[in-house]
């Protein structure tokens, strides 16, 4: 929903495998009067060829499950487990299918955990995507990064730019200056 305010794209399509989560997303779209700009589809990421075809999107944003299959403690809440663990899709599925639906030169934006960065880059190269930009996200400047933001380009060259780290909070636990600036820009885009 925030992306509709931030970009000039004419339409956004969301894909969600969990029916209840897809219904919640659809309700948010309707409550925000964005039905003409946003479509939510309940479907399996591994079926993008059937759902969409090949080379149909300019941009794909993904927030895949962070935990590799068979690792970490899987909680009792199935919906949360599917969101956090590679139960219904793997990192390879996400990157392969993203590459499939992107036009040549299209961009994929992903948020993931830094410990998976090696896998992400290898899989991007395997599926003819080039990592273009990378940003490590730190909870505080004194703490290790716990997220990585990565942009890939389908068929792009191999030059990668590592951007300055994004720090979320200062040492007192207050929003960092970077985050306040980002929130300010986002709020200026939203028309209430």
Annotate each language-model stretch with its function:
Residues 11-16:
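Conserved SAM-binding motif I beta-strand of class I
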Residues 1-10:
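Conserved SAM-binding loop of SAM-dependent methyltransferases across substrates and taxa
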Residues 190-192:
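Conserved small/polar residues in nucleotide/adenosyl-binding loops
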Residues 88-145, 149:
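Conserved Class I SAM-dependent methyltransferase catalytic core
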Residues 55, 64-93:
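Mobile active-site "lid"/loop adjacent to the S-adenosyl-L-methionine
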């Amino acid at each position: 929903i925030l992306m509709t305010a931030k970009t000039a794209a004419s339409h956004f399509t969301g894909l969600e495998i969990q029916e209840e989560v897809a219904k919640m997303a659809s309700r948010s779209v309707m409550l925000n009067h964005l039905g003409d700009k946003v479509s939510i589809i309940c479907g399996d990421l591994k079926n993008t060829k059937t759902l969409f075809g090949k080379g149909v999107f300019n941009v794909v944003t993904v927030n895949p499950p962070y935990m590799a299959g068979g690792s970490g403690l899987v909680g009792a809440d199935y919906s949360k487990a599917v969101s956090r663990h590679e139960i219904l899709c793997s990192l390879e599925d996400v990157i392969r299918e993203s590459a499939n639906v992107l036009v040549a030169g299209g961009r994929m934006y992903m948020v993931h955990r830094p410990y998976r960065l090696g896998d992400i880059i290898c899989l991007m190269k395997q599926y003819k995507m080039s990592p273009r930009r990378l940003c490590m996200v730190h909870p505080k400047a004194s703490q290790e990064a716990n997220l990585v933001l990565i942009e890939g380009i389908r068929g792009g060259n191999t030059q990668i730019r590592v951007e300055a780290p994004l720090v979320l909070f200062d040492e007192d636990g207050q929003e960092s200056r970077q985050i306040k600036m980002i929130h300010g820009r986002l709020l200026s885009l939203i028309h209430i």
